[in-house]
C-alpha cells in the first residue's frame, strides 16, 4: 500500500506526553544523561543508516534477523529514538539480539549482556515478549552478573527481582508475573509505522491514540530516566535507583485507570541532588 498524502493525528498538540506526565523538562534543568552508557537489546536498528544516533554496539543475531541490524529501521530504531528523546546526552549502544526462536534470542541476549559488562555499560533495556521458564534460568544468571557489576536493567515482562519492571499507566497486565515497579505513559509519538497507520485509515479506525499505543516504549523511557539519575549520581546502585524512582513516584488516574507509581523524574533527581546533611 502506498503511503497516504497526509497523516492526521487528532489532538496531537494537546495530548499528554512523557514530558507532561513525568516532568521531564524540569529534570532536564539538572541532567540530560551525559556520560551514561545505555544498551538496547532489540533488532532492526538501522545501525549503518543512523550513525549519529549510536555510540556503538554489536550484532549477536543469526540469519535474516542479523541482516536487519544494519540497514532496516524498525523496532530497535524506534526504541533508540524514544530513549534519545528522554536522555539526549546519553550514549546509546545497539545490541542486536532478536530471533523468532526464543532459545536463540536468549543466547544472543546472554552474549550481549556479557559484552555490556566487558564494555562498562551502565543500563540495559529490553522491550519484547516474556520468556518461558526454561529460558529464564539462563537469562536470570546473566542478569545476575550484570546487576553485580552495577548495570541497571529495565526489561518489560521480566519479573527478576533485581530488574526495574515498568508497565503502562494502568493496572498489572497478564504478561507480568509480579507487581510492576513503575508506571510509564504508554503512548509514544516519536515514530509511526506508515503502512500500519495507512491500514487503520483505510478501515476508518485511525483515531485518538491508537497508532501510538506502545507498551514497548515504557522500557526505554525508564532507561532514559535511569540515565538522567546516573548522570548526576554515578555511584547509585541498581537497588538504590529502583528505590528512588519508586519512592518519588505518585499515584495518578489516566483514561480512568489508576496507576500506583507514576514516575516523577524531576522529583527523583531533586531527591539525589539536594544538599546532604
PLM feature spans:
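C-terminal subdomain of the subtilisin-like protease fold in secreted/lumenal serine endopeptidases
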Residues: 1-7, 15-25, 123-125, 231-277
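Active-site core segment of subtilase-fold serine proteases
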Residues: 2-91, 111, 118-123, 176-183, ...
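Extracellular S/T/G-rich loop segment that most often corresponds to the catalytic His/Ser-adjacent loop
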Residues: 42, 148-151, 156-235, 239
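Short glycine-/small-residue-rich Rossmann-like dinucleotide-binding loops
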Residues: 45, 128-129, 196
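Residues at the C-termini of beta-strands that transition into short coil/loop
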Residues: 61-64, 83, 96-98, 157, ...
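Substrate-binding/access-modulating region of protease and related hydrolase catalytic domains
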Residues: 78, 97-169, 209-220
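Short helix-loop-beta-strand segments that form the rim/entrance of peptidase-like active sites
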Residues: 83-102, 236-252
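Sec-exported extracytoplasmic/periplasmic mature domains
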Residues: 84-88, 114-122, 129, 144-151, ...
Amino acid at each position: 500500500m502506498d503511503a497516504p498524502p497526509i497523516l492526521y493525528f487528532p489532538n496531537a498538540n494537546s495530548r499528554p506526553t512523557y514530558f507532561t506526565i513525568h516532568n521531564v523538562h524540569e529534570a532536564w534543568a539538572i541532567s540530560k544523561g551525559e556520560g551514561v552508557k545505555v544498551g538496547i537489546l532489540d533488532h532492526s536498528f538501522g545501525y549503518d543508516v543512523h550513525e549519529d544516533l549510536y555510540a556503538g554496539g554489536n550484532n549477536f543475531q543469526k540469519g535474516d534477523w542479523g541482516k536487519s541490524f544494519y540497514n532496516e529501521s524498525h523496532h530497535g530504531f524506534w526504541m533508540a529514538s524514544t530513549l534519545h528523546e528522554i536522555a539526549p546526552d546519553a550514549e546509546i549502544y545497539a545490541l542486536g539480539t532478536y530471533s523468532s526462536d526464543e532459545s536463540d534470542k536468549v543466547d544472543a541476549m546472554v552474549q550481549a549482556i556479557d559484552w555490556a559488562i566487558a564494555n562498562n555499560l551502565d543500563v540495559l533495556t529490553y522491550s519484547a515478549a516474556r520468556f518461558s521458564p526454561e529460558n529464564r534460568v539462563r537469562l536470570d544468571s546473566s542478569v545476575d552478573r550484570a546487576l553485580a557489576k552495577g548495570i541497571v536493567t529495565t526489561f518489560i515482562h521480566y519479573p527478576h527481582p533485581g530488574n526495574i519492571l515498568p508497565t503502562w499507566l494502568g493496572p498489572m497486565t497478564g504478561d507480568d508475573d509480579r507487581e510492576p515497579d513503575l508506571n510509564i505513559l504508554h503512548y509514544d509519538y516519536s515514530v509511526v509505522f506508515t503502512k500500519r497507520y495507512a491500514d487503520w485509515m483505510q478501515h476508518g479506525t485511525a483515531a485518538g491514540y491508537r497508532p501510538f499505543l506502545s507498551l514497548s516504549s515504557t522500557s526505554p523511557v525508564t532507561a532514559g530516566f535511569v540515565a538522567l539519575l546516573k548522570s548526576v549520581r554515578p555511584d547509585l546502585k541498581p537497588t538504590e535507583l529502583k528505590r528512588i524512582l519508586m519512592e518519588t513516584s505518585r499515584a495518578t488516574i489516566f483514561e480512568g485507570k489508576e496507576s500506583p507509581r507514576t514516575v516523577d523524574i524531576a522529583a527523583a533527581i531533586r531527591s539525589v541532588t539536594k544538599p546532604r546533611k
